[in-house]
């Protein structure tokens, strides 16, 4: 019926083709074989990045990117204005929320370790091109603003040590920038510009140099932290935590403080951007993420305890809390010692923002989504020097013209969105079948397959047919369409480096996994949490699983179950957004007991619970990674809930600015990135290659078609002149064989020959000179034999 309508309305054919092409472009995923390394050669974008980062270096980068602003700025701000001494609880809650996203990041870091670009690359190989560009574009925003804010914070620190003489000089001799900042004290911060340029030069000189500089500053910061702990013990007073003073703003203040403290943990995603420069990314990345978050939590809680015990929360200086707390007790020397640590910590935070930014730009430009000159890697420093210089200059320019207060308001929304997407991807990939784990967007395949017509569809159908590779793979059937849908057999070796254990599969399309046939059974791979639950419940555990309809050990995901999970996750995200909006903007109505608000809250909770339960009932993919996020789907769903809640807590002006930035990114993608993407260029080359053989057929009268009307019984048929070198070969038939059987054998033989020719053409380095040459060179046996 649809074919009839298509014939009656040609516009429908054109619209359908255009819509299919558009949807294919925005949903196409990056094949993992494109990231294959060549030993001793160059990478995908030219010169390879140097592998010089150890696990200690990664932990140092993660800690440094977080601990500076969190310890020296956020602790005092939250303690004074939001939670009082309850800032300790706020930091713990924020740490739990950060760990939820951190474990999801760690699993993705193991699944796709040898990449740059963090959530951008993770999204590209799993979700699709447009979503990946959107996430990468907003990661650039986060790092851009974070770098500018770090430079401005350092400038303010130096200005404070100089008794504000620097800002006074700028205002008196240069003037203010009322149009770009808030208040009369917004001035062109030349010192911040200089700081931004200097740090850009340090990062551009090379990874090893910048990481070494980062480690030195972290050591200084560690020494100052130890000094604060020891010196502060001599001035603590338990009266500051007397009854009523620990939670002066109540639990609402603690939760508000937790939302702010969460920003102190933003930055561990820098570890995920260094996969192409880490020595052992499959083990270093998850360990470094976890160790960084735990280290930051320890530093924040300990500093908050000393701060709130030394100074009543009402007397805390929100701009420089740790420096001024010793001044209140007359210990001026300690103030300058803490100032040294503040400068070191803020500098490391500045490096933590600037270090990953050029690597995200490098990854996007190398894929063609941004201008390709940004993907140039310096042969001297082995760093993306062009991207580093361009991004560093833009950050320094922002620090010069925009005030610190305005920069902070835009700092976190892009990061929270990236964290949310990573959690979504982890949840989706766990429940996809083995064939679709590389691209779960194949739930649209049923509709898409009906749209494909013509030579390209036949080529794709034939290219994706299972074939035997002979001696190379021992005759094992393999899928040959890896460049479009599935990773190749060697992807696992590429993505996880040299296997540390023999359990890594080297012949399975699920890259980054452990081969279950190597002796690791399902019971042995159960998590510690599941084993404890089994011991606790005993035989009732299996009875409960049966009654709840949970999948068995031998159940495997299918396309249908994967599609169910995909739809449930989409609905889960939408309903989480509605639920958080109701909690934030309808809290007053809920507290007043208005029936519609309470009813809506209950309905949302029930539907969210139902969706999670439906996901639990679907079988998981049995393949194991060296590290996997625990308690799926609860951990990713909880991370989504927390991140969406914090995003909605941001101000309206932040959302407006975020919308403008996204609009510019959409223009760049649809105007440049979509048409210059590496995947787009590859698709064009494949289409041109296929159309070459189509043109050979168009101008040739097909004398070889077999038709009952043209090939009556007893005739020699049109094959009498088909032979090699002009030799004639007469088609022979056995007299006892019916004519219909001969025709069936002929059709089968022609189909097999066509498949052989197509595979031969796809491997040829040059196109065939013509259809006639193919006929002359053909050495086929008699088609009816």
Swiss-Prot record:
Summary of the knockout phenotype: Morpholino knockdown of the protein causes smaller eyes compared to wild-type animals and aberrant light-induced locomotor response.
BP term (GO), one: eye development
Record bears the keyword DNA repair: no
Pfam families: AA_permease_2, AA_permease_C
Disordered as annotated region, ranges: 715-785
TM annotation in the entry: 58-78, 83-103, 119-141, 187-207, 216-236, 251-271, 291-311, 337-357, 360-380, 384-404, 407-427, 568-588, 596-616, 628-648, 655-675
Signal peptide interval: none
Biased composition (Low complexity): 727-740
Subcellular location, record wording: Lysosome membrane
Predominant subcellular localization, coarse grouping: membrane
Composition skew (Acidic residues), residue ranges: 775-785
Gene3D superfamilies registered for this protein in UniProt: Amino acid/polyamine transporter I
InterPro entries named in the record: AA/rel_permease1, CAT_C
GO function term, MF aspect, one: amino acid transmembrane transporter activity
Keywords: Lysosome, Membrane, Transmembrane, Transmembrane helix
Residue pairs linked by disulfide bridges in the UniProt entry: none
Domain of life, source organism: Eukaryota
Membrane topology: Multi-pass membrane protein
One GO cellular component term: lysosomal membrane
Family: Belongs to the amino acid-polyamine-organocation (APC) superfamily.
Family annotation (PANTHER family): CATIONIC AMINO ACID TRANSPORTER-RELATED (PTHR43243:SF25), INNER MEMBRANE TRANSPORTER YGJI-RELATED (PTHR43243)
Described purpose of this protein according to its UniProt entry: May be involved in arginine transport.
Protein name (record): Probable cationic amino acid transporter
Record organism: Danio rerio (Zebrafish)
